[in-house]
């Protein structure tokens, strides 16, 4: 269906949990352990009900996020049941990759088509520093197992000033040697991210162009989503740029988000939305739920305003919202 600005909304991002097995520095405080109580999370049945009603009004693609979605029990059955919904064409997962390698075969057999894996460095010491408790080898193993099981892979990378800027060329080589896409995501001022200085994608692109032969004269191509892509000579995959801060893509936004506790967010930046979990637990019918979702989608804000401090911005951390 379309929102009031005429954008076709066909993509649902639904967070299964705020819990995570890492403590990435720009996402979560090092000693954080105060997560949403299980009784406040949407149940798997409630999640499935939301997906079904969204599918009935035009949602075609579902992405499961977190926190780390793979720490949520029952995720395989959830994917299996979502895959049974006729209108859903694609099920995807965003993950840090730590737990994925040993689960990807079963997930794929039950309907998972794509994964986005967060990876900001190829140096073990830096990986430990940024994630605080992670092991790089497990992420690389997960990428390998995804390719073995024909699950399409995108790598999401955040470049931070004075941390991993010197690894840009090493990171893009992942897309040279493998049929995967690597996307640079500009750091957004959400939660712990406000404490760090990111690098703009225009600067990253210039670094790449100095060392690699970029096809199509270096022009970026936007496909279905916020990323703009370039092709590099000899590369099996593409390089993408998600430039939320320097190149607003809101006019093409096609998504709606649901947080772990069932709050349907109309925009990543703004706090506007409605709690679907509470409505369901108060006994509303499927038809009533569908109408609430339709109204929420229709009222999506025109654009974010991350560059300005606003009284109506969402103060929550990314892991609480759903990355």
From Swiss-Prot:
One GO biological-process annotation of the entry reads: Mo-molybdopterin cofactor biosynthetic process
Keyword terms: 4Fe-4S, GTP-binding, Iron, Iron-sulfur, Lyase, Metal-binding, Molybdenum cofactor biosynthesis, Nucleotide-binding, S-adenosyl-L-methionine
**Could you list the residue ranges forming a coiled coil in this record?**
none
Which positions does UniProt annotate for [4Fe-4S] cluster 1 binding?
20, 24, 27
Q: Enumerate the Gene3D superfamilies for this protein.
A: Aldolase class I
- Subunit description: Monomer and homodimer.
**What name does this protein carry?**
GTP 3',8-cyclase
Question: What is the organism of origin for this protein?
Answer: Clostridium perfringens (strain 13 / Type A)
Q: Which gene encodes it?
A: moaA
